[in-house]
Amino acid sequence: NLNKNKKETIFNHDLKINSEKYLEVTNKLIPTGKIKKVKNTINDFNNFQNIGEKITIIKNKKIKRVSNTINQLGFDLTFCIKKNSKNYLASLKNKKTNIQLDFYSNLPGVQLYTSQGLRYKNKLAPYQGVCLETQHYPDAPNNKNFPSTLIKPNKLYKYFTKINIS
């Protein structure tokens, strides 16, 4: 949450994700193995999009999202990152506070979670946080069309995530 008052929602945050595809999931949020295109869908964040507007569209159109497991609507989805030389992943900004986070990683995916299910001892409420979690594709060992997560002996693996704050 990039607001000064952390009790405010993330509805005034804008998000951009370097992705043309996302992982389809079951109603239990398990990847089906299908990779879907984001173009012309509610999941398209290729240009900065307001998170609050996207969630409002989901609610108003009553789009059934698989993340609606606890009667809340929002995002809980893995995006497949487009490969690029600078490892650019995503940007999150708040125009009101003028804070921006730019994410870089060599991992192939990022999980977007808009905290629709967030409840913590009356201190946190739904939509008071947003998570961008760099990762391999969930359930990759069971989906041969996903990038491999097999770790071989005597081979060095280096993964990084970098966040620039401005």
Regions inferred by a protein language model and the residue ranges of each:
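An exposed, glycine/acidic-rich loop-and-rim segment of catalytic or binding clefts
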Residues: 1-166
